[in-house]
Design a protein with these regions (language model features):
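Conserved SGNH/GDSL esterase-like catalytic core that processes O-acyl groups on lipids
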Residues: 56-58, 181-280, 306, 314-319, ...
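C-terminal hydrophobic structural anchor segments
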Residues: 304-331
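Generic structural signal for well-ordered alpha-helices
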Residues: 291-295, 325
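Short hydrophobic segments within beta-strands
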Residues: 73-76, 161-162, 210, 263, ...
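Short glycine-rich catalytic loops that host catalytic nucleophiles or stabilize transition states
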Residues: 340-345
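N-terminal secretory targeting modules
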Residues: 5-188, 375-377
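Histidine-centered active-site loop/cap adjacent to the catalytic His
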Residues: 348-377
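The substrate-binding groove and active-site-proximal loops of carbohydrate-active enzymes
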Residues: 278-285, 348-351
Length: 377
């Protein structure tokens, strides 16, 4: 792994502007983030087009090129916890690369020993949730390489709101399928193997994952940020925490999904499992009212989308799913539906592994395809 320094200059309003210049222009070509032929997907902070910040899991940038035997990426990582890994798809081969340093530019070798006279496709994607974010400063290829128009995103669009299961946390610990999680520092986390991204691939759809490990619906519950931040106050943000958690807000006009999947209602049992303790009690009713209000806010942003309400196969008390079904019936929205997996709430005590996620994707994609003939219109 090559690591080089990056000149950094401060711009107005305290915004940090990064430009990578430490390379030999006689042998290396820099592909800037604003290059017309790059394809982006995901809830990415493009406030500075020359230095987009990858925040949400599954976000990616894709490039097609010829004339280079290798390709590298320049990133600047900000780590909150866990080790930091990026995901790579090189001509459809999927693997990971570790970011060894934080708060300084790092050059990551994404692929090498490529045939120069062949067109290659490279995708740099965010494997993990907001345990880290990174600034993308461009690709490096051999001098004389040609960038070609990248494969376009599918016409179909889907979006997921969820927690660690939706983000693909610990999905690569395949030897622990159906078991509690092994000790790890994030090396098993991979959004590519989440049921969410797998569902999108089965449907041949573009996907946005708005997901964070530990998050619940309501502020003051769940594990994320010690329970201070819930999805109800984060769903319209790019960043869920830190100095940028308030701004910039996400512009919903940038991505209009045909289908929205809401998979919240598992971490909500912490610090108290209110559905198990008293399903008809005041706290449980308050949760259902907050859930209903959240759905109304989603509907305001997506007036024509199908909204699928669900949880996952991660073990949890079934009262949460009954509450979701109750809200679904009460709102009387013909395009808001409730879905349960075959092993819903009882499939595993640990996070969902890749094989389990593939089964979930099979069930969910089949359900979505059966919603209506015009689901993708």
């Amino acid at each position: 792994m090559d690591e080089k320094n990056l000149p950094v200059k401060k711009a107005e309003k305290g915004i940090i502007m990064q430009r990578y210049t430490d390379y030999d222009e006689t042998t290396v070509r820099m592909i800037q983030p604003v290059h017309d032929e790059l394809t982006y997907c995901g809830r990415i902070d493009h406030s500075d087009p020359d230095a987009p910040v990858f925040v949400q899991p599954g976000s990616f940038v894709r490039m097609s090129f010829t004339g280079s035997s290798w390709v590298r990426a320049v990133v600047m990582n900000h780590r909150s916890y866990n080790d930091s890994w990026v995901g790579v798809l090189s001509d459809r081969n999927q693997y990971r690369v570790k970011i060894e340093k934080d708060e300084e530019p790092v050059v990551l070798t994404l692929a090498e020993n490529l045939e120069r006279d062949t067109t290659h496709e490279i995708t740099l994607f965010k494997r993990m949730d907001q345990c880290h974010t990174y600034v993308f400063l461009g690709f490096l290829v051999e001098y004389g390489a040609r960038v070609e128009k990248a494969r376009p995103l599918p016409r179909k669009k889907i979006e997921f709101y969820g927690d660690s299961v939706t983000a693909g946390e610990v999905s690569e610990a395949q030897n622990y399928a159906g078991m509690p999680d092994p000790p790890s520092e994030g090396e098993y986390n991979n959004a590519y193997f989440s049921y969410a991204w797998a569902t999108a691939r089965r449907l041949h759809a573009a996907v946005h994952l708005v997901a964070q490990g530990g998050i619940a619906l309501r502020d003051g519950t769940g594990y994320y940020e010690n329970g201070t931040r819930g999805m109800e106050s984060c769903f319209d943000r790019i960043y869920f925490s830190g100095e940028k958690s308030g701004e910039p807000r996400w512009n919903f006009a940038r991505y209009t999904p045909h289908v929205v999947v809401v998979a919240i209602g598992q971490n909500d049992a912490w610090p108290e499992d209110i559905m198990k303790n008293d399903y008809y009690g005041e706290q449980a009713q308050q949760w259902r009212e907050h859930y209903k209000a959240f759905l109304c806010r989603l509907r305001e942003n997506y007036p024509h989308a199908w909204i699928v309400l669900t949880t996952t196969i991660l073990n949890h008390y079934p009262g949460w799913d009954r509450s979701i079904g109750k809200v679904c019936a009460e709102i009387r929205d013909p395009k808001t539906v409730h879905f349960l997996y075959q092993e819903n709430g009882r499939g595993t005590p640990g996070h969902v592994r890749a094989s389990e996620a593939m089964q979930m994707a099979l069930e969910l994609s089949g359900f979505i395809e059966g919603l209506a003939p015009d689901v993708w219109d």
